[in-house]
Amino acid sequence: MDLLSDIEKQLQKATAQAFLIALSGGLDSTVLLSLFAKLCQKQPHLQILSLRAIHIHHGLSPNADSWAKHCQDLCDQFQIPLIIERVQVDKTNGIEAGAREARYQAIKKHLQTQEMLVTAHHLNDQTETFFLALKRGSGLQGLGAMQQQSVLFGMQILRPLLGFTRPQLEDYAQKEKLNWITDESNKDNRFDRNFLRNEILPELRARWAYFDLAVQRSAQHCFEQQQLINDLLSEAFAEHCQIKNQFKLCQFRKYSLAKQTALLRMWLAENQLEMPSKRQLTQLINDVVFAKEEANPQFQLVNKIIRRYQDRLYLTKPFSDLTKYCLKLEQNTLSLPDDLGNLSVQENEHNLIFHWQDFSVTLEKTDLPISIRFGYSGKVKHHPKRPREDIKKIWQELGVPPWERNRIPLIFYGNELKSAVGFFRVFDEY
């Protein structure tokens, strides 16, 4: 089957009718753009309601500006709207990883609701991805490599060229007289993917003509086996993960290590996090899951923190220390630190009504200065019929995790605590 007919059949089964093409300007994405431009001419048969392209300008090559211009000229030729997005690449974890992260985050910013991202990954890319996963010691999920349709970083992705080899794309490009750019970094074998592409895989293909197809079959077997494991564990997973960013530990410690790691991987995948290594998962289980009952353990995984409280794991972002903040409330709205949103106040004849997120509290008016603080130690009277109690005990009764307690806005009249917004107000003693 030829490229055009195959992609046409794929689009008839696709779950979207609006598409955003990832366009680098290289051979693969240029062929992809040409194919979609041709398919658009078959309207209304395919019902492609929207077609756009996006080019990510990484700024890593001296030729980056000319590549962006080439992509613009190409899209003008095909009459397809193009977005050019410049990004800054964080090289902390390597250029390849940083560029990939920056690229997908930039694309996610522009991807519209009901729009599907289309990438030009082909069969040779699939082989490289499989070998890179093998090099990392990946399990079934990693060795499953890429699927024709999947979700990545919360985006629906279609890879319609996955069944075709690069030579097949080259044949199409030559017949259509397409022009494309060549990234000079593709020859740099310091990068793992280039080393495989330029040095290792050509030798294997020379010996075994159908090597890429065999790798694709193995990847598909791995993917299907992982799906089977997920299906078999789905009932247990639903019991442990009833809230997306929480994981109940009841009965969990009785499972085998293999079942524990599989369920935790499912939880992390549910939250769209990159898979940790086996060593990291074992450390998470030993240091957090099996930590002493009175401990408040935590484990950092990339840009997230896994914490434990009342026999549950919680997935949170790293939080700033807010205990030194003292914010004067001098207007009707106050912007709170560390992405906590705004606190606002309304006034009626006798009271002030404070609003924060979905919470509110009504307090009597005052002539004292009003401030918002975070974190408090000492005793408070939070119920009219109960004595003053240590605030730590109150937080425990309310089921507020330790890391959240210093993130709840506390309203002070002068130096007197009046309320923890959304949780309790302080009553006077008589």
UniProtKB/Swiss-Prot annotation:
**Catalytic reaction list:** cytidine(34) in tRNA(Ile2) + L-lysine + ATP = lysidine(34) in tRNA(Ile2) + AMP + diphosphate + H(+)
Give a yes or no for keyword Disulfide bond in this entry. Answer: no
Highest taxon of the lineage = Bacteria
Which InterPro entries has this protein been placed in?
Lysidine-tRNA-synth_C, Rossmann-like_a/b/a_fold, TilS/TtcA_N, tRNA_Ile_lys_synt, tRNA_Ile_lys_synt_N, tRNA_Ile_lys_synt_subst-bd
Instruction: Indicate where this protein is primarily found.
Output: cytoplasm
Location comes to: Cytoplasm
What does UniProt give as the signal peptide span?
A: none
Task: List, in alphabetical order, the Gene Ontology terms for molecular function in this entry.
Answer: ATP binding; tRNA(Ile)-lysidine synthase activity
Q: Which Gene Ontology BP terms does the record give?
A: tRNA modification
Assigned keywords, A-Z: ATP-binding, Cytoplasm, Ligase, Nucleotide-binding, tRNA processing
Q: Which GO terms describe its cellular component?
A: cytoplasm
Q: What is known of its domains?
A: The N-terminal region contains the highly conserved SGGXDS motif, predicted to be a P-loop motif involved in ATP binding.
Query: What is the purpose of this protein?
Result: Ligates lysine onto the cytidine present at position 34 of the AUA codon-specific tRNA(Ile) that contains the anticodon CAU, in an ATP-dependent manner. Cytidine is converted to lysidine, thus changing the amino acid specificity of the tRNA from methionine to isoleucine.
Q: Which family is this protein grouped under? A: Belongs to the tRNA(Ile)-lysidine synthase family.
Q: What is this protein called?
A: tRNA(Ile)-lysidine synthase
Q: Which organism is it from?
A: Haemophilus influenzae (strain PittGG)
Origin organism lineage: Bacteria, Pseudomonadati, Pseudomonadota, Gammaproteobacteria, Pasteurellales
Instruction: Name the gene.
Output: tilS
